[in-house]
Each structure stands twice: as C-alpha cells, then as structure tokens.
C-alpha cells in the first residue's frame, strides 16, 4: 500500500504549514511507515493511505515518487 506522509524536517521547531513537506512511501501499515521514518527524526504530522481514485489523481497531478528507505 502507498502512504502519503506530511512532515516537518526538524522535530525541534514549531510546525508551520508553509514548511510542511510530503513524501510517498510503500508500506504495509501506518505503523510500518512511522517505523521506517523513525531514524530520520521527522515531525510527522499526518499519514494518509492513498488508494483507488485518490492514487490515480496523485499520479496524474502530483510529483508522486516513492521514497526508498534503506
């Protein structure tokens, strides 16, 4: 399943909407997403599963590139 993750790069700063970044990640669950991103110390605001029509929309209208976490 593909997830869209809204996050701030620095955990120590107050979240500001204009600084929110997005990445797309393939994982089995929201917990798996958070586990994979844990080592980056991102301030994760929201994790959203992207399926069906929503996925097709994101592919057509956004820069949907899956992040590879090693």
UniProtKB/Swiss-Prot annotation:
Catalytic class of the enzyme: transferase
GO biological process: DNA-templated transcription
Highest taxon, organism lineage: Bacteria
EC nos: 2.7.7.6
GO CC term (a single one): DNA-directed RNA polymerase complex
UniProt keyword terms in alphabetical order: DNA-directed RNA polymerase, Nucleotidyltransferase, Transcription, Transferase
Known catalytic reactions: RNA(n) + a ribonucleoside 5'-triphosphate = RNA(n+1) + diphosphate
Pfam family, one: RpoY
MF annotations from Gene Ontology: DNA binding; DNA-directed RNA polymerase activity
Record Gene3D superfamilies: RNAP, epsilon subunit-like
Similarity-based family: Belongs to the RNA polymerase subunit epsilon family.
Subunit structure as annotated in this protein's UniProt entry: RNAP is composed of a core of 2 alpha, a beta and a beta' subunit. The core is associated with a delta subunit, and at least one of epsilon or omega. When a sigma factor is associated with the core the holoenzyme is formed, which can initiate transcription.
NCBIfam families: PRK13667.1 (NF010188)
Physiological role: A non-essential component of RNA polymerase (RNAP).
Name of the protein this chain belongs to: DNA-directed RNA polymerase subunit epsilon
Organism: Bacillus anthracis
Gene label: rpoY
